[in-house]
């Protein structure tokens, strides 16, 4: 998925910790082979290159993910659009589980979804092994916290200023929940753009969202980067959100 993952697992001996870590790595490799649109061997890459010519069948898991993304599209009033152009140009056949693009230029991009999905998969692995204290940091933008820090009642997560890495612009406490931070980084300014206008919101540098569900947190942090203030409140009302912060810097 083009980034690193750090895991802090507490309360487990070396044997169990290594076993859990190997399962986590295997799961990330598996998900990358399905969801990474840049990997020529991934399922999503195949869909993007075939669906413009003819209906393309997808696996059961990817089909469920795409159906989930359609629900997020509706719940965010169209601001979460994985088509990168016009979601109405993507046809889904519910009987055959196929995807077809009715216009050129359509590419499915799960960049605002995949890390949240991966964190929820990792959560299942941790829970299956009765791990109750852990901190999973995915690319310094997506975080899963189980239990609390051993010297406190929560995990305190600092939000860095991407334009001044030594500066912390905020802190969010996590306990059995997740955090997603989206932003216009110096190297990726404007990579999150409004599907209705094709423009990015220059006034919003960082958005951080904490929520019980990692996918919800990632989708909402992504959409709040581009939604106006009226839609911002409407979108947030559609989800169970613990806290969200918008930084203009």
Where do the protein language model's features map onto the residues?
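Mature catalytic core of soluble alpha/beta enzymes
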Residues: 1-249
